[in-house]
Amino acid sequence: VATAASMNGYPSSIGAVLRDGLKCTVPATPPVLIIGDTDLLSAAPPELTGSGYADLLAKPCSVADWILAREVAGEGFEEEPLRIMDGVVEAVVAAADGIAALNPASVESLMLGLTLSGLSMAAAGTSQPASGAEHLISHFWDMLGHRDSWRLDLHGRQVGVACIMISALRERLLSLEE
């Protein structure tokens, strides 16, 4: 039972954990059913819902990195995960005011988007459709925070900030003359 629309890991077959201060990916068994009661999800702390929103907004950043990995390094790339996510970010952006107001129907669209994001990773057999450089930066902050006893922010909010940073860097790189 999902208690907050805060992340896309509910359907995931992997998990990111800290082991001896190092962020690692470990296999996980995905559930056969995800229950997301909209009244319960809408009653979650707004910070958690906002974290899920920021994490979902970062998906275009992840996809851009996945495409870049295909073009530059010849890494595998699947179209199906993109089809799964087609229109999801746009629908959630359109519901932004309702999500901020914790409107049950709007929070339901966020939860659906996060669930589809997790399913896109399962379809690809990799986290790349939903986790790019923005997640690596967030994981790095987690490791530094663990080492230096920092108070960290919620995962999705860290990812959102890192996505802004990566997007600015990508724009700068694309503007360089050859």
Describe the function of each predicted region.
Residues 3-91:
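A glycine/threonine-rich phosphate-anchoring loop and its flanking beta-alpha core
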Residues 83-178:
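Active-site segments that bind and position negatively charged phosphate/pyrophosphate groups
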